[in-house]
Swiss-Prot record:
Signal peptide: none annotated. The lineage of its organism: Eukaryota, Metazoa, Chordata, Craniata, Vertebrata. This is Myosin-1. It is found in: Cytoplasm, Myofibril. Its main location: cytoplasm. Residues 1128-1147 have a biased composition (Basic and acidic residues). Belongs to the TRAFAC class myosin-kinesin ATPase superfamily. Myosin family. ATP binds at residues 179-186. The modification N6,N6,N6-trimethyllysine is found at residue 130. CDD domains: MYSc_Myh1_mammals. Required for normal hearing. It plays a role in cochlear amplification of auditory stimuli, likely through the positive regulation of prestin (SLC26A5) activity and outer hair cell (OHC) electromotility. Muscle myosin is a hexameric protein that consists of 2 heavy chain subunits (MHC), 2 alkali light chain subunits (MLC) and 2 regulatory light chain subunits (MLC-2). Interacts with SLC26A5.
Length: 1939
């Protein structure tokens, strides 16, 4: 196992490949009982872990880890491996090899995301269903050149081993990858190809061929690009896999003599043709069909004559049509790119798409049966025409060939009739044949392209084929797949055990050869041998009358009862009938033979095949070339005319031929096996289903391999290693002191151990063990080591104790000796003789001094002579030393020169390394940039789709709003007509009725014109939407640009603002039209109401205005009060903040004092901890209370601002209405007089037309002045119209120029797309070049290491010389110090003992001082806590003041409710006035009824018009009750109050719940709170009373509002009843109106003519104004676009210049942009959610649209104010949240500080003062009392916070309702402008990117050249260094010899 340092080369992939050292050590040390730890069989989980409880009578009782107890048989219990085998990398090395051990090892590794595991020769991989970082370039580099045992299991390891074996053994290799669908075979195949394309890269492009469009990339690119193309045509969605390969493939990658890629080819097997015409519900057909219909390339849709809806084509829509994990548009581009890279010509590319489209059309061919015949005939020719056109055929010939095919009978051809079903079968067979042959042809073309004609020597084959399949319904396809796996398993068994047994033979082990490959022979022979299943199937296909039944009977006759592998299936309920069963190695499979004969023959319509051969599509003709006579393959089949008269090759024969070729290829290679496992059916990462995995392990041969392995000796070890490791088991078996061979030692050792001696064998170099024995030896070794270590520890401890005891004895003897001598001296010190001795002894020495002097003189003379000799010798040595120093200096100069040269070489090498690192960074940057661009491109594509969806939804919203507006206008117009008609009927003005009818028609025309204008606006939006879609499609290919993504958010904001501006312009134009219409309406409103009604309304409105002004004043006063309260709250918050800082400072002082004291008692620690927590909690409560108060104040302030704004708007509306009514009053007076005279004239001369004309002339004279004004206006408008037409032409010309510019940009975009493709290819080349450069740098680094080693050797030689020079000096110093230290050693020991005693005394004194300091510190703490209690009392008083302020706010809220109640009463009075007016109108209607009783005979003629008037009267009644609006507003307010009431109720309930929780806390700590409990209970009771009082107040308010609402409902019901009564009266009145209308018709003819002229003039004026506005809008739009384009051009130019100056800044921006992309994605998701919410709100608001339309502008202003207030509130809220978060962090820090101080307080537990403890307890009790008060205040503050949050949500909803719809429409319009600007930006960026790429390429080539030069210089330096090294060694040798 590798160390963590060795695993570091794998980077971030290391944890996913191998366990860390820590985990391995933990596993080895884990407790484990080998006798009781087992796996046990269990029905649900297959196997579970457990512990053996007992064994008796062949039964075992096991307790599982889940706690269940199972009693099972002995053979259902499997021993568990020791913990050191947990997550083992090679399962063949496990002690106990069985199914549960394999299963749990895979499961535990999978849980740790180690998905690769070895199992002997296998590599097992489990699909992780998530991305793991184990395939990057770092991992590829780490595995390169590593042996299998040196690196963790990985597909790269398998690949590298195959590659290395190929190079070293000169043998072809193969990698067999098998597994079920969805297990990851295709992905692992891609990784193998990726590995070879990386390590064996050529880096050279193939030579260009003359055919255009070929050779778009290197060989590596083409090998990699072959995969997307094959996946498009051969992969499909299945139930278990979204990208399942429906064919097998064998990819051969050929290498040259140097190991570089030379070429490649692909062989395919068993393409699932049936999927072309049939799919299950949860599956779909091949990807290519849906890619084409994704509309990513619209030219394909046009070329193939198809639609984009898959459901239009039967062959591809039988299952699902979309796959969430696959982007068909992007996949189409990848497929198309792969076709180009692989060198297909343009004609071949078109042919591929055409044939694919023809297959789709084939599924839509319809046929019917002729009458009275079974003959089929075409049912329409349209589809046949399309299919024939795509295939280059004549449609008539095609249909004729299908319905009347020609068959050969003898030597003649006859025409045969076909039934409808036969024709459909033929069509399906043709479609499958065309698709199959086209797929095989593409594979052939790919192989031709990958064949580079370069010299190639060996290949590595990768086999990706489906694994063993056992389904409920198994057909011929499953038999072929299972037979293939049977052959592969036989091949594996043979290969695996042949290798094993060859090793046994080589090692000389006695072994009886077993051919495990023959284990499967019976099943294989049953299928493929003569008279086998395939043989009988082909024989049956020869007979024309053969059926499935005859085939089954032959099978039974031939094999049932004769072959053990062939059985009759057992009938199973609920499953499809099976006809026979085969026993495969992986299990028994039931096969159903229905349709096998047809599948095997695969017949084709010969006549249609003949047409295909003559097709004008060359590819189709080539596909069927060589198909002669009856079948497309008659001439080419190998068995034609030879096997039982067969003239065709069957599917089974072709399959066996391909399989034999495959097995031949595999037998010629050295195989490597990879088994892919699917862990679960739900694609859940990390989950493993036991039964599913075991089934696959059986099917793919893993357990079969284990079975074979167990029969042999899977564990083996070298003799020397075995002796070294297991010698401890019996050391006496190997004699000491004499040589013994390792083999003999191993034999003796094993013979002396109590084990089964049949479980191992001795080879020549290794000892071989059966499975499990090595684990037993390991356990025995562990036990022996434990015993030895225990014994060693005991002996070591004994020896150390004895040494210490000896030292103690020696010290005691020395002390006794010293004491004895000192006592003896003290005894004789005063003895007289001793004193005399002390005096005489110095005198005795003087006599001897003269002798000593004489001797010294002699010695001096001798010394003098010796000194002279020494001086002479010294001078001689000095001369020698000078010479040596000279030589030394010379050598040092040489060494210095060498060092300098070496330093230069190292410096150059470092520069090269730095250059290489920079290049790698640049290459990595470009690679990451490309990957980011691809990801961004995908994200932007998704965003584009979302924007398109939003656009369509917004368009629908616009339509709905326009319809609503039209409806409102129509209803308004109808209401006005009703009022007009009622007035005329009451006055009896028949002439006026006809006149108003004419005006009504004119207004309808105007209304229609308005609708036309709205339609024109809608068309504009549609045009812009189409332009946006087109531009987005053009920009998709360039969306990878990083700079555009950086600005995307800003562009979207600009787009939104621009669209808002455009929509506002459109709304203003609409409003202008409405104003024009309203001007006409004002003429009609002159006759709408009587004078008395107008007077009463004016008076009512004036009274209401006075009331509203009064309310405004009151609200303003209220706002001032609230502002004062807010200021007070802020002041209290500032005080609380100050107190918090004081408490923090005090806490720091506490910490310092506690550090000085060194600790306190455990009780004090606990109290201090609680006290600090309480302080923090009180601080937090105060801050939360402040936050809540301010939030409440902000909410109230916003509410009052909204109320003031609303009331102000109502006053403005009322004043406008008042002015309007006064104007109407004066005009109506004049017109009433005129109408009165007209009425008299009409009543006197009903039949006299001349009198009526004169009356009209009188009326016209009164209108003469108005007509003259209109005429003058018409003249002005005519001139203006001409001028506008001129401007319109100019604007149209400018618009055309802009369109031309857009088309030019589109063409430029296509060119840039091609340039980007080229840049991508260049990027890939740079990546490959980077790999080569990395190899070169690696070799340079190696050379540098050699130079560094040489330099170190020179340094060592130099140091050796220095050591030799200093050695003599050191020896002299050692001798000198030795005698000095011996003399003073004993004195130092005494001094040391004295110092120790002094030190102990000093320590004791310091301890006493520390205790005194602790006492003083505790006294200080006591004083400080008293001060804190006083501060907290002040805080409580402030909190009480805040509560009082809240109570004041509550009283103000009650006052507001009372004001609203008064407003409701006033509204009720207005309603009663309206009812009074209704009653007066009813009386007048009765009068009209009596006056027109004679008109009953004309009822029928006016019935339809009267019905319309009936509806209009009902609307009029609703409009008369204008108080209804205010009632509706009061209802809204009531609902709000109810909601607030419910919120307050919820808050109160929460407060009660919190109170109960706090009471529970009080009960738990009641022992500590006895002193303050009564006070807390009293305060809680007071707060409860306040809450109850607040509840009662709100209940009373709600009850009063409910009663008012009931009264309002009753009044509305009365109004409805009155309305119904009026409708009945109106029906009677309508009968009377008919007669008067007919009489007045003639009189109004001239008036109509005049009115018509006026209306035409008005229409022309409106048209001119609209044209002018449209042109102005277009001009403004074009100018804005131009300005935006110019501004972005300048901005991008500056940005790119800055990028050139600083590349590092660009890299940082890359990271920032990636983060912003994620942010934009998050914001986009948020906007989508908001949009959905708004759609729901819009549907709720539509019912109130009438009121909203009339007050739209006022509502917009109100919304702006609301947004401003909401923003302010959000800022304040965020500010307070930040403050709260900061305080929370401080709290946590302080709590941590207290915890740290707690440990220091433990030491002083016994020294704490009892008095101090009592005082602290009292203070803590007081603190808790204050805490209770603060918490009670907190409860009320929580209620306020909840109210604030709900109001914030309401503000946001109102803001979105008024703003978001308009913003969404404007955003889309501006997006179009942004995309147009981006086209130019992309163009410039592409050009600059190309230039930058060229610069980088030139730099790279320059650096590569420099690198080569550096390598040459390094070689020269190396040779020089070698020379210097030799020379230096010679000098060194010379110096040593001279010394």
């Amino acid at each position: 196992m590798s160390s963590d340092q060795e695993m570091a080369i794998f980077g971030e992939a290391a944890p996913y490949l191998r366990k860390s050292e820590k985990e391995r050590i933990e596993a080895q040390n884990k407790p484990f009982d080998a006798k009781t730890s087992v796996f046990v069989a269990e029905p649900k989980e297959s196997f579970v872990k457990g512990t053996v409880q007992s064994r008796e009578g062949g039964k075992v009782t096991v307790k599982t880890e889940a706690g269940a107890t199972l009693t099972v048989k002995e053979d259902q219990v499997f021993p568990m491996n020791p913990p050191k085998f947990d997550k083992i990398e090679d399962m063949a090395m496990m002690t106990h090899l069985h199914e549960p051990a394999v299963l749990y090892n895979l499961k535990e590794r999978y849980a740790a995301w180690m998905i690769y595991t070895y199992s002997g020769l296998f590599c097992v991989t489990v699909n992780p269903y998530k991305w793991l970082p184990v395939y990057n370039a770092e991992v590829v580099t780490a595995y390169r050149g590593k042996k299998r045992q040196e690196a963790p299991p990985h597909i790269f390891s398998i690949s590298d081993n195959a590659y290395q074996f190929m190079l070293t053994d000169r043998e072809n290799q193969s990698i067999l990858i098998t597994g079920e669908s969805g297990a990851g075979k295709t992905v692992n195949t891609k990784r193998v190809i990726q590995y070879f394309a990386t390590i064996a890269v050529t880096g050279e492009k193939k030579k260009e061929e003359p055919t255009s469009g070929k050779m778009q990339g290197t060989l590596e690119d083409q090998i990699i690009s072959a995969n997307p193309l094959l996946e498009a045509f051969g992969n499909a969605k299945t139930v278990r896999n979204d990208n399942s390969s429906r064919f097998g493939k064998f990819i051969r990658i050929h290498f040259g003599t140097t190991g570089k890629l030379a070429s490649a080819d692909i062989e395919t097997y068993l393409l699932e043709k049936s999927r072309v015409t049939f799919q299950l519900k949860a599956e779909r057909s091949y990807h290519i069909f849906y890619q084409i219909m994704s509309n990513k390339k619209p030219e394909l849709i046009e070329m193939l004559l198809i639609t984009t809806n898959p459901y239009d084509y039967a062959f591809v829509s039988q299952g699902e049509i979309t796959v969430p994990s696959i982007d068909d548009q992007e996949e189409l581009m990848a497929t198309d790119s792969a076709i180009e890279i692989l060198g297909f010509t343009s004609d071949e590319r078109v042919s591929i798409y055409k044939l694919t489209g023809a297959v789709m059309h084939y599924g839509n061919l319809k046929f019917k049966q002729k009458q009275r015949e079974e003959q089929a005939e075409p049912d329409g020719t349209e589809v046949a025409d399309k299919a024939a056109y795509l295939q280059g055929l004549n449609s008539a010939d095609l249909l004729k060939a299908l319905c009347y095919p020609r068959v050969k009978v003898g030597n003649e051809f006859v025409t045969k009739g076909q039934t409808v079903q036969q024709v459909y079968n033929a069509v399906g067979a043709l479609a499958k044949a065309v698709y199959d042959k086209m797929f095989l042809w593409m594979v052939t073309r790919i192989n031709q392209q990958l064949d580079t004609k370069q010299p190639r020597q060996y290949f590595i084959g990768v086999l990706d084929i489906a694994g063993f399949e056992i389904f409920d319904f198994n057909s011929l396809e499953q038999l072929c797949i299972n037979f293939t796996n049977e052959k592969l398993q036989q091949f594996f068994n043979h290969h695996m055990f042949v290798l094993e047994q060859e090793e046994y033979k080589k090692e000389g082990i006695e072994w009886e050869f077993i051919d495990f490959g023959m284990d499967l022979a019976a099943c294989i022979e049953l299928i493929e041998k003569p008279m086998g299943i395939f043989s009988i199937l082909e024989e049956e296909c020869m007979f024309p009358k053969a059926t499935d039944t005859s085939f089954k009977n032959k099978l039974y006759e031939q094999h049932l009862g004769k072959s053990n592998n062939f059985q009759k299936p057992k009938p199973a309920k609920g499953k499809v009938e099976a006809h026979f069963s085969l026993i495969h190695y992986a299990g028994t499979v039931d096969y159903n033979i229905t349709g096998w004969l047809d599948k095997n023959k695969d017949p084709l319509n010969e006549t249609v095949v003949g047409l295909y051969q003559k097709s004008s599509v060359k590819t189709l003709a080539f596909l069927f070339t060589g198909a002669a006579g009856a079948d497309a393959e008659a001439g080419g089949g190998k068995k034609g005319g030879k096997k039982k008269g067969s003239s065709f090759q069957t599917v089974s024969a072709l399959f066996r031929e391909n399989l034999n070729k495959l097995m031949t290829n595999l037998r010629s290679t050295h195989p490597h096996f990879v088994r892919c496992i699917i862990p679960n059916e739900t694609k859940t990462p990390g989950a493993m289903e036991h039964e599913l995995v075991l089934h696959q392990l059986r099917c793919n041969g893993v357990l079969e391999g284990i079975r074979i392995c167990r029969k042999g000796f899977p564990s083996r070890i070298l003799y020397a290693d075995f002796k070294q490791r297991y010698k401890v088991l019996n050391a006496s078996a190997i004699p000491e002191g004499q040589f013994i061979d390792s083999k003999k030692a191993s034999e003796k050792l094993l013979g002396s151990i109590d084990i089964d001696h049949t479980q191992y064998k001795f080879g020549h170099t290794k000892v071989f063990f059966k499975a499990g024995l090595l684990g037993l030896l390991e356990e025995m070794r562990d036990e022996k080591l434990a015993q030895l270590i225990t014994r060693t520890q005991a002996r070591c401890r004994g020896f150390l104790a004895r040494v210490e005891y000896q030292k103690m004895v020696e010290r005691r003897e020395s002390i006794f000796c010293i004491q004895y001598n000192i006592r003896a001296f003290m005894n004789v010190k005063h003895w007289p003789w001793m004193k005399l001795y002390f005096k005489i002894k110095p005198l005795l020495k003087s006599a001897e001094t003269e002798k000593e002097m004489a001797n010294m003189k002699e010695e001096f003379e001798k010394t003098k002579e010796s000194l002279a000799k020494a001086e002479a010798k010294r001078k001689e040595l000095e001369e020698k030393m000078v010479a040596l120093m000279q030589e030394k200096n010379d050598l040092q100069l040489q060494v210095q020169a060498e060092a300098d040269s070496l330093a230069d070489a190292e410096e150059r090498c470092d520069q090269l390394i730095k250059t290489k690192i920079q290049l790698e960074a640049k290459i990595k940057e470009v690679t990451e940039r490309a990957e980011d661009e691809e990801e961004i491109n995908a994200e932007l594509t998704a965003k584009k789709r979302k924007l398109e969806d939003e656009c369509s939804e917004l368009k629908k919203d616009i339509d709905d709003l326009e319809l609503t507006l039209a409806k409102v206008e129509k209803e308004k117009h109808a209401t006005e007509n009703k009022v007009k008609n009622l007035t005329e009927e009451m006055a009896g003005l028949d002439e006026t009725i006809a006149k108003l009818t004419k005006e009504k028609k004119a207004l309808q025309e105007a209304h229609q014109q308005t609708l036309d204008d709205l339609q024109a606006e809608e068309d504009k939006v549609n045009t812009l939407t189409k332009a946006k879609t087109k531009l987005e499609q053009q920009v998709d290919d360039l969306e990878g640009s990083l700079e555009q993504e950086k600005k995307l958010r800003m562009d979207l904001e600009r787009a939104k603002r621009k669209l808002e501006g455009d929509l506002k312009l459109a709304q203003e134009s609409t409003m202008d039209i409405e104003n024009d219409k309203q001007q006409l309406d004002e003429k009609l409103k002159k006759k709408e109401f009587e004078m008395s009604n107008l007077q009463s309304k004016i008076e009512d409105e004036q009274a209401l205005a006075m009331q509203l002004q009064k309310k405004i004043k009151e609200l303003q006063a209220r706002i001032e009060e609230l502002e004062e309260e807010i200021e007070a709250e802020r002041a209290s918050r500032a005080k609380a903040e100050k107190q918090r800082s004081d408490l923090s400072r005090e806490l720091e002082e506490i910490s310092e004092r506690l550090e000085e004291a060194g600790g306190a008692t455990s009780a004090q620690i606990e109290m201090n901890k609680k006290r600090e927590a309480e302080f923090q909690k009180m601080r937090r409560d105060l801050e939360e209370a402040t936050l809540q108060h301010e939030a409440t104040a902000a909410t109230l302030r916003k509410k009052h601002a909204d109320s003031v704004a609303e009331l102000g708007e109502q006053i403005d509306n009322l004043q406008r209405v008042k002015q309007k009514l006064e104007k109407e009053k004066s005009e109506m007076k004049m017109e009433i007089d005129d109408l009165a005279s007209n009425m008299e004239t009409v009543s006197k001369a009903k039949g006299n037309l001349e009198k009526m004309c004169r009356t009209l002339e009188d009326q016209l004279s009164e209108l003469k002045t108005k007509e003259e004004e209109q005429q003058r206006l018409i003249n002005d408008l005519t001139a203006q119209r001409a001028r506008l037409q001129t401007e319109s032409g100019e604007y149209s010309r400018q618009l055309d120029e802009k369109d031309t510019l857009v088309s030019q940009l589109s063409r430029g975009k296509q060119a840039f797309t091609q340039q980007i493709e080229e840049l991508k290819r260049q990027l890939e080349e740079e990546i490959k070049a980077k790999s080569a450069l990395a190899h070169a740098v690696q070799s340079s680094r190696h050379d540098c290491d050699l130079l560094r080693e040489q330099y170190e050797e020179e340094q060592e030689a130099k140091a050796e010389l220095q050591r030799a020079m200093s050695k003599a000096n050191s020896e002299v110093a050692q001798w000198r110090t030795k005698y000095e230290t011996d003399a003073i050693q004993r004195t130092e020991e005494l001094e040391e003992a004295k110092k120790k005693l002094a030190q102990r005394l000093q320590d004791a004194e310091e301890h006493v001082e520390a205790v005194n300091a602790k006492c003083a510190s505790l006294e200080k703490t006591k004083q400080r806590l008293q001060n804190e209690v006083e501060d907290l009392m002040i805080d409580v008083e402030r909190s009480n003041a805040a509560c009082a302020a809240l109570d004041k706010k509550q009283r103000n809220f009650d006052k507001i409710l009372a004001e609203w109640k008064q407003k409701y009463e006033e509204t009720h009075a207005e309603l009663e006035a309206s009812q009074k007016e209704s009653r007066s109108l009813s009386t007048e209607l009765f009068k009209v009824k009596n006056a027109y009783e004679e008109s009953l005979d004309q009822l029928e003629t006016l019935k339809r018009e009267n019905k319309n008037l009936q509806q209009e009267i009902s609307d009029l009644t609703e409009q008369i009750a204008e108080g209804g609006k205010r009632i509706h507003e009061l209802e809204k307010i009531k609902k709000q109050v109810e909601q607030e009431k419910s919120e307050i109720q919820a808050a109160l309930e929460e407060a009660e719940a919190s109170l109960e929780h706090e009471e529970g806390k009080i009960l738990r700590i009641q022992l500590e709170l006895n002193q303050v409990k009564s006070e807390v209970d009293r305060k809680i009771a007071e707060k409860d009373e306040e809450i109850d009082q607040l509840k009662r107040n709100h209940v009373r308010v709600v009850e009063s509002m409910q009663s008012m609402l009931d009264a309002e409902i009753r009044s509305r019901n009365d109004a409805i009843r009155l309305k119904k009564k009026m409708e009945g009266d109106l029906n009677e009145m309508e009968i009377q109106l008919n007669h008067a209308n007919r009489m007045a018709a003639e009189a109004l003819r001239n008036y109509r003519n005049t009115q018509g002229i006026l209306k035409d003039t008005q229409i022309h004026l409106d048209d001119a104004l609209r044209s002018q506005e449209d042109l102005k809008e277009q001009l403004a739009m074009v100018e804005r676009r131009a300005n935006l384009l110019q501004a972005e051009i300048e901005e991008l130019r500056a940005t790119l210049e800055q990028t050139e100056r600083s590349r590092k800044v660009a890299e940082q921006e890359l990271l920032d942009a990636s983060e912003r992309v994620q942010l934009l994605h998050t914001q986009n998701t948020s906007l989508i959610n908001t949009k959905k919410k708004l759609e729901t709100d819009i549907s709720q608001i539509q019912g109130e649209m009438e009121d909203i339309i009339q007050e739209a502008r006022n509502a917009e202003e109100k919304a702006k104010k609301a947004i401003t207030d909401a923003a302010m509130m959000a800022e304040e809220l965020k500010k307070e949240q930040d403050t709260s978060a900061h305080l929370e962090r401080m709290k946590k820090n302080l709590e941590q500080t207290v915890k740290d101080l707690q440990h220091r307080l433990d030491e002083a537990e016994q020294l704490a003062l009892k008095g101090g403890k009592k005082q602290i307890q009292k203070l803590e009790a007081r603190v808790r009392e204050l805490e209770g008060e603060v918490e009670s205040e907190q409860k009320r503050n929580v209620e306020t916070v909840k109210g604030l949050r709900k109001h914030e949500r309401r503000v946001k909803e109102l803001t979105y309702q008024t703003e978001e719809d308009r913003k969404n429409i404007l955003r889309l319009q501006d997006l179009v402008d942004k995309l147009q600007a981006k086209v130019k930006s992309y163009k410039r960026q592409a050009e600059e990117a190309e230039e930058q790429s060229n610069v980088n390429l030139s730099k790279f080539r320059k650096l590569q050249h420099e690198l080569e030069e550096a390598e040459e210089r390094a070689d020269i330096a190396e040779s020089q260094v070698n020379k210097l090294r030799v020379k230096s060694r010679e000098v060194h040798t010379k110096i040593i010899s001279e010394e």
